[in-house]
Swiss-Prot record:
NADP(+) binds at residues 164-166, 230. Pathway: One-carbon metabolism; tetrahydrofolate interconversion. Homodimer. This is Bifunctional protein FolD. Keywords: Amino-acid biosynthesis, Histidine biosynthesis, Hydrolase, Methionine biosynthesis, Multifunctional enzyme, NADP, One-carbon metabolism, Oxidoreductase, Purine biosynthesis. It comes from the Bacteria. The gene is folD. Transmembrane segments: none annotated.
């Protein structure tokens, strides 16, 4: 059994990225810049944003955090996004989710300029992804794919079950893996026999946030298991995932830990997406 060490791979990605950014800075180009919009004071969102900003600093990406209270109006948020869209110093915009209930997430995700859409949630970027074109990909799905690639795991012709159908992870991941030649089964809360799908799969990817959902008897021998769940165990207060790790790992050929698996990859892909958008803007503003 091999641990898919997202922390290690993420560190390597960040080291490479810093060198690439330094190359641009040595040519007197401006720094890449990420603008982060954080609404309210949700502890999980605060932690995620803090980690993202620290990661930006490590690789030489400038970041600006724009904080707003829980009661921000739609008009105020729309105005702020428009300002960032029109600010040539900003290469990428991150709207930290979830938003308060009175704000329509899709409305504001679609308001972000697709050429500044660091999360890859804009319909234009998702349409390109659907058609198999190079684009800005959602961070967690592309992080999972790059983690598999780092361990030379080829998904072509693999039977893959994805549990969870969110627009952030499950759906885009299914499209991307399908475009790479995998056979995909998608399961949700209405799936009658989850075990029927997972037991036959070469790769099982769980994205539900339900502790210990995936148990040993649901996995075939030498399967690859990817755990996207992040849950605080109410008894131990430790961070755990969807997978009963200690028991499931006995059967796996590869498995991601929680923490230290998919999470670090998501952050490093945010950095890569920011740099990708930066390069587009450099080409547009400096080289044309």
């Amino acid at each position: 059994m091999v641990i898919l060490d997202g922390k290690l791979v993420s560190k390597q990605i960040k080291q490479t990225l810093k060198k690439q950014i330094d190359t641009y800075l040595n040519k007197n180009y401006k720094k890449p810049k990420l603008a982060v919009i954080l609404i309210g004071n949700d502890p999980a969102s605060e932690l995620y944003v803090s980690n993202k900003i620290k990661a930006c600093n490590l690789v030489g990406i400038e970041s600006v955090l724009l904080r707003f209270g829980q009661n921000i109006t739609s008009e105020m948020l729309s105005d702020q996004i428009n300002q960032l869209n029109n600010d040539n110093s900003v290469d990428a915009i991150l709207l930290q989710l979830p938003l308060p209930k009175h704000l329509d997430e899709q409305e504001f995700l679609q308001a972000i300029d697709p050429l500044k859409d660091v999360d890859g949630f804009h319909y234009i970027n998702q349409g390109k992804m659907l058609e198999g074109y190079d684009t800005i990909y959602p961070c967690t799905p592309i992080g999972i794919i790059n983690l598999l690639k780092a361990y030379n795991i080829d998904v072509r012709s693999k039977d893959i079950t994805i549990i969870g159908t969110s627009n952030i992870v499950g759906k885009p991941l299914a499209i991307m893996l399908s475009n790479m030649g995998a056979t995909i089964s998608m399961c949700n809360k209405n799936t009658k026999s989850l075990k029927k799908y997972t037991k036959r799969s070469d790769i099982v990817i769980s994205t539900t946030g339900k502790q210990a959902l995936i148990k040993k008897d649901m996995i075939k021998k030498n399967a690859i298991v990817i755990d996207v769940g992040i849950i605080k165990d109410p008894i131990t207060n430790k961070i755990v995932g969807d997978v009963d790790f200690e028991n499931v790992k006995e059967l796996c050929s590869y498995i991601t830990p929680v923490p230290g698996g998919v999470g670090p990859m998501t952050v490093s892909m945010l950095l890569e997406n920011t740099f990708k958008l930066y390069k587009l803007h450099i080409k547009e503003n400096y080289e044309n």
